[in-house]
Amino acid sequence: MENNILELRNVTKEYDGQVVLKGISFNVKEGEFITLLGPSGCGKTTILKIIGGSQKPNSGEILFEDKNLIPIPINKRQFNTIFQSYALFPHLNVFDNVAFGLTIKKTKKDIIEREVMRQIRQVGLEGYENKKIDELSGGQKQRIAIARALVMKPKVLLLDEPMAALDVKLRKTMQEELKRLQQDIGITFIMVSHDQEEALSMSDRIVVMNQGTIQQIGTPEEIYNEPENAWVANFIGSSNIITDGIFLEDNKIKFDGKVFECIDTNFGENESSIDIIIRPEDIIIKNPNNGFFNAKVIKTTFKGIHWEIVVETSKKRQWIIHTINEYDVDQQVSIKWKPANVHVMWKEVDN
């Protein structure tokens, strides 16, 4: 995955004078699964529409295989889109839905038969060729939408929140299947999602967006473990963010009257324009007087796979902790963490 198949350079978009994309730049490698992740209204779907050709940017460049993509009409782009609604034709059976694009192109019947059946087998629905769309489950409809897109042999598959209409259990199953399918066929997937867990589990890289700007680009591990700002840290899972700490020097921070080790460097000396993040799952609960701070449990919530515990120290700082152990409200404890689980980042600067 070394070659860029797609590149956006300083792309902007306005609707009725409102700027919805503010200089978007990123690249997509050939064979990569990349997710545009962010809350509703952040601009991620607009980017997908611009790449697909249904909308034009106000400014900027888009290169596909090093050639200007913007003037190429939508029907000439080597992309296919899977929409949230799947956009299947209810009056056609499964075979004819998958074959639709090839039929419109007047492809020979023997080629249609071969390619459609190959894709139906690929998505695990052999034997469903003559079924009507309304006879299919949500997961089966999604597979047919995928087969219909892939039969056209696109170089890039665009996915607009494809799992949004599925229930939680089926969504997880389809996430695994879609990732496996992408790895098997090896083409580039660009997916839009507002689901953090979905993006983390499926993507090679994630483009995190908010209010028309890119907040961070990185692998799932980089996004989760090394967020570039407090907004990303809060959006990708819950976080304990210390906004009033000081970076004393390389590998040393200070807050609430105590000095702690960390693994971060190059933030200067006695620097206060930083935020410090410690994830809830990285905090260790100990018996009183065995940690960095003594604290009292003030809230407990069972989350299914763990307990979420909120404790408050004598400094009146509250900490969110994820643990498999149960604690009682008002129970006295202490808390600590490892230096490698402390993450320092620059404070966000308002433009």
Curated annotation (Swiss-Prot):
ATP binds at residues 38-45. This is Spermidine/putrescine import ATP-binding protein PotA. It comes from the Bacteria. Gene3D superfamilies: 2.40.50.100, P-loop containing nucleotide triphosphate hydrolases. Transmembrane segments: none annotated. It comes from Mycoplasma mycoides subsp. mycoides SC (strain CCUG 32753 / NCTC 10114 / PG1). SUPFAM superfamilies: MOP-like, P-loop containing nucleoside triphosphate hydrolases. It is a peripheral membrane protein. It catalyses: ATP + H2O + polyamine-[polyamine-binding protein]Side 1 = ADP + phosphate + polyamineSide 2 + [polyamine-binding protein]Side 1. The complex is composed of two ATP-binding proteins (PotA), two transmembrane proteins (PotB and PotC) and a solute-binding protein (PotD). NCBIfam families: MMSYN1_0197. The lineage of its organism: Bacteria, Bacillati, Mycoplasmatota, Mollicutes, Mycoplasmataceae. The keyword ATP-binding applies. Its main location: membrane. One of its GO terms (molecular function) is ATP hydrolysis activity. Part of the ABC transporter complex PotABCD involved in spermidine/putrescine import. Responsible for energy coupling to the transport system. One of its GO terms (cellular component) is ATP-binding cassette (ABC) transporter complex. Belongs to the ABC transporter superfamily. Spermidine/putrescine importer (TC 3.A.1.11.1) family. It is found in: Cell membrane.
